[in-house]
Amino acid sequence: MSSEGVITSFHRLKNVYFGGQQEHGLRPGTTPVALVAGMGKACELAQAEYKEEAKGNRAIRDEMLDLLKKEGVRYELNGDPQYCIDSTLNICFDGVSSEALMLSTKQYCAISNGSACTSKSYDPSYVLTAMGIPVDKIESSVRISWGPGVQNKDILNNFKEMLRVIKNLAI
């Protein structure tokens, strides 16, 4: 087996540019101009994609809220949707245990009743508590979020199925 083209720790890379000793002598200058330019382009693309993504996420969120109203589900939003992340809803479903809802929908829906960093804690959400939401409302609250790459129809179909479960669990 040939080892051509393999660089080991014993090989010294040759400089392309000469001058300072940044990056262990590989290149001169404090600022890696090519990397800065690349990062700038990446940020430009991310910003352009974000605007489209945010618009689509708001449409999904609005459709979910419309479905809740049409189905007559009792709910309260935790937080002002104008200031929330477009791809996340935190909703209190009156009379529905968030734990029961999570267990009943775990086959097709990834929802949570707290942050990932407190998933082993059974205490009420410290964020919702800080917002002044009563404990009984916190215990009926879930966070629904979705991300890029998930088809809108899949999100909405799963949400419709979740609404069916909510109606069955509501007291």
Language-model segment annotations:
Residues M1-H24, P28-K41:
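Active-site PLP attachment segment
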Residues C43-D66, E76-I85:
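Structural signature of PLP-dependent enzymes
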Residues L35, P124-I171:
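PLP-dependent enzyme catalytic core of the Aspartate aminotransferase-like
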